[in-house]
């Protein structure tokens, strides 16, 4: 396997340990299950529909987003470096009858023989877990067709995001295991757009996501000061 240096073994091990709870709707990945309908809707609406399109989910983990995209008719490949999460994803896909190809590989290595192959590439909640986000973004750009879309989501780096995602979500509300995130690895929108601008991708849209702990509901917001997604498109 080539180009596998952009991997943090501690990050992989962290998600390996949590893999068995990936599909527990009230477990450690409950926030991802609550957030996923917003992610899916944003991807489907922005692209004009992913039915029948080839989609790659980079950093797919246990397959929450991958399965939801496959259920609405996308041809999905899921990519991750964690063997345990991938096994969970494969088993769950078998149980639910969803057809997804899961591959253990890095984005960089997978891109070597998938140049311009996908209509849509998603990279959600993944960039803050790798040593070199720029390398992943370039690989995602390489793998999407001209005119295709690449979606990224991550967390802004500021005092509010530290309070909400680490002090709040990990320590106070216990929504996530302590140590899930490292605030120093969060990425400001301006930084992410600069990384995108170094490729053939153009940022087309950005949207924030906010969580109400009283209602337990995620919703879109124009503010990108904590969780946010961007939609990019490859230049023809």
UniProtKB/Swiss-Prot annotation:
It is an enzyme of class 2 (transferase). S-adenosyl-L-methionine binds at residues 39, 59, 80, 124. GO terms for biological process: methylation. It catalyses: a 3-demethylubiquinol + S-adenosyl-L-methionine = a ubiquinol + S-adenosyl-L-homocysteine + H(+); a 3-(all-trans-polyprenyl)benzene-1,2-diol + S-adenosyl-L-methionine = a 2-methoxy-6-(all-trans-polyprenyl)phenol + S-adenosyl-L-homocysteine + H(+). The keyword Methyltransferase applies. GO terms for molecular function: 2-polyprenyl-6-hydroxyphenol methylase activity; 3-demethylubiquinol 3-O-methyltransferase activity; polyprenyldihydroxybenzoate methyltransferase activity. Its EC number is 2.1.1.222, 2.1.1.64. Pathway: Cofactor biosynthesis; ubiquinone biosynthesis. It comes from the Bacteria. Signal peptide: none annotated. InterPro entries: SAM-dependent_MTases_sf, UbiG_MeTrfase. The keyword Hydrolase does not apply. Keywords: Methyltransferase, S-adenosyl-L-methionine, Transferase, Ubiquinone biosynthesis. PANTHER family: METHYLTRANSFERASE, UBIQUINONE BIOSYNTHESIS O-METHYLTRANSFERASE, MITOCHONDRIAL. O-methyltransferase that catalyzes the 2 O-methylation steps in the ubiquinone biosynthetic pathway. Belongs to the methyltransferase superfamily. UbiG/COQ3 family. NCBIfam families: UbiG (TIGR01983). This is Ubiquinone biosynthesis O-methyltransferase. It comes from Shewanella sp. (strain W3-18-1). The lineage of its organism: Bacteria, Pseudomonadati, Pseudomonadota, Gammaproteobacteria, Alteromonadales. The gene is ubiG.
